[in-house]
């Protein structure tokens, strides 16, 4: 048999494996440094019995960077941990590591070594399922795939959720499966959070995970945040305090506790915890963004107290805090160039500092990003609209972006905020000019979106009386 035929045969076997090379993990090239950093943080600071999968993911990341020898070392570490962590399932848990070994050796041109690991996988499949294939369907493998997808970012979360659901169907009381499922449901709930969402399902999955993992401080901290989301802040704080007293996953607990106290308005404590976490993980984009948000909240608080007219010491405090917020937001986007939320926060702070050019450039950069999900697009258009309305004093352009946020078919807080901002702006224009056809049409459109058909018709009819040939089935697009 020719070399090419041998290679094709091995490739066919490799593609049957269940491992990081076949799970179609969605990782953009610009995200690799941040992903590698997060994996290192988890290896160093996350107290878990499931580090085999983390070392496997690190090996895959090393391969993506072209560092195959380093990847082999990470796989060796995963192999060394398999027996201590999974004594009762070491053979099944080894299949992912062996699959990664096989793929890695194949990419390095080591066909004989690749075949050795393929044979290892095949032997386990034959032993446990009487199958001669190179893959096995079992909840442990579904769980391994779920963890890999979960750790690779938001574009993989829906598939991760399906994997953990499959695993839980077989073993609903499994602590590891429950933990993975609770985390991915929490993340997805955060992405898709609409104002009318109760978060009850997410809350129940977290409570189940805490019940099955009573010593897991990480999960307790997430439960505390979710309780805060659903207006049970006092109950949530109990879990946060409990997590803070634990020695487990301290750095991660600091992160989430800081977020909790920032949202509660206890900004000094939030900053203290953020700085403690940053001391351990200075390359965390998430932490830099959270720290920047603490400073931003301080600015909002000063403006609130001074009725948006800070003077004297208050003005000096804002001038001191704004550069600190900018510094952390800049660091966040530098560490994670696809961090859309941080770009929006950074643009707002540039505007606060009076640097409209940098603010405009930053908004344009994030608007031009590929594969931005609906919720984030609404967030960007709303905040860009605010910048255009209040900093650039461009009502026409602001209206355009509020409309873009509203037209996206997705219920979200930022969509509601855009509706309210657009209604205020159109009403203000109408008070200046009662015959403003554009504002009448926009108000008609807003009431239509809100399901208030009678009110919508009233505004459309007023607009038609002023311009009989006006098309009212869609909102008037602002003229540029």
Give short role names for the model-derived ranges.
Residues 40-47, 81-92, 124-138, 177, ...:
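Flexible helix-coil transition and linker loops at the boundaries of alpha-helical arrays
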Residues 22-38, 64-82, 110-127, 153-161, ...:
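Helix-turn-helix repeat elements of alpha-solenoid scaffolds
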Residues 124, 128-247:
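Solenoidal tandem-repeat scaffolds enriched in leucines and small polar residues
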Residues 1-56, 477-479:
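N-terminal alpha-helical scaffolding segments that mark the starts
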Residues 15, 50, 56-57, 64, ...:
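"A position-specific structural signal for the A-helix of alpha-solenoid helical repeats
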Residues 62, 105, 149-150, 185, ...:
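Residue at a conserved register position within TPR or TPR-like alpha-solenoid repeats
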Residues 54, 97, 131, 177, ...:
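TPR alpha-solenoid repeat register
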């Amino acid at each position: 048999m020719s070399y090419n035929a041998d290679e094709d045969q091995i490739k066919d076997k490799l593609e049957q494996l269940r491992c990081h090379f076949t799970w179609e993990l969605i990782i953009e090239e610009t995200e690799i440094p941040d992903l590698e950093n997060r994996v290192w943080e988890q290896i160093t600071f996350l107290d878990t019995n499931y580090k085999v999968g983390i070392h496997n993911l690190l090996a895959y990341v090393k391969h993506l960077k072209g560092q195959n020898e380093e990847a082999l070392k990470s796989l060796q570490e995963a192999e060394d941990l398999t027996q201590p962590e999974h004594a009762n399932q070491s053979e099944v848990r080894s299949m992912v590591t062996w699959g990664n070994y096989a793929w890695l050796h194949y990419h390095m041109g080591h066909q004989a070594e690749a075949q050795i690991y393929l044979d290892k996988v095949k032997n386990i499949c034959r032993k446990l399922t009487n199958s001669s294939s190179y893959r096995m369907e079992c909840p442990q493998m579904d769980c391994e795939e779920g963890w890999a997808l979960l750790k690779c970012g938001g574009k993989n979360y829906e598939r991760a959720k399906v994997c953990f659901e499959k695993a839980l169907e077989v073993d609903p009381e499994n602590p590891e499966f429950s933990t993975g499922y609770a985390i991915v449901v929490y993340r997805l709930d955060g992405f898709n959070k609409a104002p009318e969402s109760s978060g009850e399902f997410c809350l129940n999955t977290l409570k189940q995970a805490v019940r099955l993992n009573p010593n897991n401080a990480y999960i307790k901290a997430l439960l505390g945040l979710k309780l805060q989301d659903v207006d049970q802040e006092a109950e949530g704080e109990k879990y946060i305090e409990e997590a803070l007293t634990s020695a487990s996953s301290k750095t991660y607990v600091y992160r989430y506790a800081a977020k909790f106290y920032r949202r509660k308005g206890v900004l000094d404590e939030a900053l203290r915890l953020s700085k403690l976490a940053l001391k351990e993980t200075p390359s965390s984009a998430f932490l830099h963004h959270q720290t920047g948000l603490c400073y931003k909240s301080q600015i909002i608080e000063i403006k609130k107290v001074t009725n948006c007219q800070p003077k004297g010491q208050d003005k000096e405090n804002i001038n001191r805090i704004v550069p600190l917020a900018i510094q952390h937001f800049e660091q966040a986007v530098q560490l994670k160039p696809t961090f859309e939320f941080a770009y929006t926060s950074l643009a707002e702070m540039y505007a606060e500092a009076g640097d409209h050019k940098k603010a405009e450039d930053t908004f344009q950069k994030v608007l031009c990003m590929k594969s931005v999900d609906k919720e984030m697009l609404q967030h960007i258009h709303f905040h860009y609209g605010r910048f255009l309305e209040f900093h650039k004093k461009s009502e026409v352009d602001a209206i355009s972006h509020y409309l873009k946020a509203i037209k996206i078919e997705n219920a979200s807080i930022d969509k509601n905020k855009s509706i309210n901002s657009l209604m205020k702006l159109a009403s203000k224009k109408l008070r200046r000019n009662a015959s403003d056809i554009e504002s009448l049409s926009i108000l008609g459109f807003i009431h239509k979106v809100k399901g208030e058909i009678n009110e919508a018709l009233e505004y459309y009819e007023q607009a038609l009386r002023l311009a009989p040939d006006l098309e009212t089935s869609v909102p008037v697009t602002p003229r540029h």
